């Protein structure tokens, strides 16, 4: 199969980017590639052979049809208008045309200086590229909309962060890299015609069913609201904290993008802050749904020159309903409830209150809940709690609720095990792989990637054990 690339952004949106080539690293070498994703994309195995060098993965060559460019956008960061931002370290190499008619972006992170690098050096480090590759593939395996990682290249280039680190590149694959901040950029530059031009572009390429509809802009924004609300519900369900939900990190397609100081919950603490630069807790785990709406409000403001304010507000008013409907559906599945009753939220909230008081492990608690037998008063989860009386009280209510379900125990438990992962990407697991990779040993990186592909499978290794004390509630740097 020959890879085919289009250049829609390059050809249709002049003034939205700067064309430039990647800047290769010193002695770049491929250390990991995503064979499964490569197969899905039809990427020839020969491109990953050691004798071919870093090639396109290290920005040393381009594939036919690629027109590399850096996109310009702006955004609100931590609630404050930050002005022009843009691709400061990444370059959109091209858009691959797939056999099903869709396209995907090939975006090279760490590709060197661009006009939008500001005070940065245009580079990424091995630590951050490993973290993004692990997180994006973990989220994909959990069924959450996300960008993907295709390859990692390391090098002898030294990059200054808190300390000197190895320069690296990551090939990111996504349906689109359009962010809320793309629209904000031209709105604040008082160029509403370009905001509309970009809206027309994304509708044509990602919502073609509405391209000729008189209400296409309203229908499109309504769907952006719904996708964002659904994504927030997914994050909350699996215990994922993004850490830096600036408007320039919000995907117009409702994808999880820009993995930086993220973290999955260990102990259930709703105020968990994974980003050590988030001093006020703006992007804490429990605040994410509210921030999602705030970011949509900023997007709506940017679209107000050509969408009526009333229509924008009507769409925004649907956010909470979509969020709670999707979240409720997902959490009922985690509880093994196939039907819906009025008191289901009370059961869930009582469990969360108990978990929060005890610092119960979020992932392990729900996984073990899948071993419940509705006609047995015993639960293997009981030994996980110090407050046995509190657990017994909650479990009696939960078991009574299960008894009103017709689904047999074995079928319900199998269903629960298909939605409650045995394994998530805990920060300490990622850090262990990073530490070894920085010493030139990539075996753990490969092992961890392999394990993350099947998060719902039972395991008996430390990938599913409680984190060590040093690994709990890790806060991570924004630096990449």
UniProtKB/Swiss-Prot annotation:
GO molecular function, one term: magnesium ion binding
Binding site for Mg(2+): 249, 258
Enzyme Commission number: 2.7.7.-, 2.7.7.108
Tree of life domain: Bacteria
Pfam families to which the protein is assigned, alphabetical: SelO
UniProt keywords, alphabetically: ATP-binding, Magnesium, Manganese, Metal-binding, Nucleotide-binding, Nucleotidyltransferase, Transferase
Active site residues according to the UniProt entry: 248
InterPro entries (alphabetical): adnlytase_SelO (IPR054838), SelO (IPR003846)
Cofactors (names): Mg(2+); Mn(2+)
Binding residues annotated for ATP, in chain numbering: 86, 88-89, 109, 121-122, 172, 179, 258
Catalytic activity: L-seryl-[protein] + ATP = 3-O-(5'-adenylyl)-L-seryl-[protein] + diphosphate; L-threonyl-[protein] + ATP = 3-O-(5'-adenylyl)-L-threonyl-[protein] + diphosphate; L-tyrosyl-[protein] + ATP = O-(5'-adenylyl)-L-tyrosyl-[protein] + diphosphate; L-histidyl-[protein] + UTP = N(tele)-(5'-uridylyl)-L-histidyl-[protein] + diphosphate
Claim: Transferase is one of the keywords in the record: yes
Enzyme class: transferase
UniProt entry tagged with the keyword Cytoplasm: no
NCBIfam families, per the entry: adnlytase_SelO (NF040880), PRK00029.1 (NF000658)
Job description of the protein: Nucleotidyltransferase involved in the post-translational modification of proteins. It can catalyze the addition of adenosine monophosphate (AMP) or uridine monophosphate (UMP) to a protein, resulting in modifications known as AMPylation and UMPylation.
Family in the record: Belongs to the SELO family.
Listed name of the protein: Protein nucleotidyltransferase YdiU
Organism the protein comes from: Enterobacter sp. (strain 638)
Lineage of producing organism: Bacteria, Pseudomonadati, Pseudomonadota, Gammaproteobacteria, Enterobacterales
Gene: ydiU
